[in-house]
């Protein structure tokens, strides 16, 4: 090996997860970012592949691999392969993609493809089996993306945010997601906060059709004494937690803030929290998941 070659400069991403969750789209996004990509690499070839990367002496330093479920030996061979890569001085990030049962079933019906574990079983049963087989691997993942509500373009954008040229320079990247409990909680959230106890702009006729991006709604929510106390305490809690997440090696944290419909209170607080955390030198992304849903419909604050 040439003197001066720094193996810590190697960025290897292993893409795995549920069949039908979008692994092919994810690796195409990484290819657009300049990664050397290999689809469907058998896990037992990981150590040999690592040797080839090291012997390239830095000519290939951004690598993305898709590794799919491959029967009962999948976990043993992958775990051993990751261990051997670590012994070679190569650290891998695991990106795990998942989606809800309903979405996966719909995707399979639309594509008319067979699930890799189907055999004679129903698609639903195959999905449940795969979830069980991948449960431990999901727990080891560095990053998890739930693609249930994502278009191909949105998934690509998330991959760009996670692995783009500036992604490695921040000690911790934080995604703050506002959402409505009536639509379910974000499946990839690490922290969830229910703010339905705060004053609800929905019941103010002049504010009902506005959102937390509008100044009148922000003033209504933030002027409440309860909101002021809550924001001070919650911000203090996050300031305590974030350095500990960083110390444990976590690179991406998803914070969910939910109200009833995801349009007023949660949007306001997500924006305000993001503005406060930017001053703490974290890379912040804000997503308002449900802000455009059910406009003019029932209770939606």
UniProtKB/Swiss-Prot annotation:
**Record keywords:** ATP-binding, GTP-binding, Nucleotide-binding
What positions does the entry give for GTP binding? 68-71
Q: Which domain of life is it from?
A: Bacteria
Residues bound to ATP: 17-24
Does this entry carry the keyword Transport?
Answer: no
Record HAMAP family: RapZ_like
- Family recorded in the similarity comment: Belongs to the RapZ-like family.
User: Could you identify this protein by its name?
Assistant: Nucleotide-binding protein Helmi_06460
Q: Which organism is this entry from?
A: Heliobacterium modesticaldum (strain ATCC 51547 / Ice1)
């Amino acid at each position: 090996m040439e003197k001066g070659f720094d193996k810590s400069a190697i960025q290897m991403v292993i893409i795995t997860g549920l069949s039908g969750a979008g692994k092919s789209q994810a690796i195409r996004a990484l290819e657009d970012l300049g990664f050397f990509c290999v689809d469907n690499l058998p896990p037992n070839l990981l150590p040999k592949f690592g040797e080839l990367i090291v012997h390239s002496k830095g000519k290939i330093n951004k690598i993305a691999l898709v590794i799919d479920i491959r029967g009962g030996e999948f976990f043993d061979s992958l775990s051993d392969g990751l261990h051997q890569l670590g012994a070679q001085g190569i650290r891998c990030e695991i990106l795990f993609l998942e989606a809800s049962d309903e979405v996966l079933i719909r995707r399979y019906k639309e594509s008319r493809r067979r699930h890799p574990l189907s055999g004679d079983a129903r698609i639903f049963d195959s999905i449940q089996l795969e979830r069980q087989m991948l449960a431990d691997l999901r727990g080891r993942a560095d990053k998890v993306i739930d693609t249930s509500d994502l278009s191909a373009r949105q998934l690509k954008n998330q991959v760009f945010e996670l692995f783009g040229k500036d992604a490695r320079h921040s000690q911790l990247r934080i995604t703050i997601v506002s959402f409505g409990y009536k639509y379910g909680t974000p499946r990839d959230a690490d922290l969830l906060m229910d703010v339905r106890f705060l004053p609800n702009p929905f019941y103010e006729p002049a504010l009902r059709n506005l959102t937390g991006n509008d100044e009148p709604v922000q003033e209504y929510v933030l002027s409440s004494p309860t909101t002021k106390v809550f924001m001070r305490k919650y911000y203090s809690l996050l300031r305590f937690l974030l350095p500990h997440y960083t110390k444990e090696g976590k690179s991406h944290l998803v914070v969910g803030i939910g109200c009833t419909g995801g349009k007023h209170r949660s949007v306001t607080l997500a924006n305000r929290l993001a503005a406060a955390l930017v001053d703490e030198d974290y890379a912040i992304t804000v997503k308002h998941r449900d802000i455009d849903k059910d406009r003019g419909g029932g209770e939606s604050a």
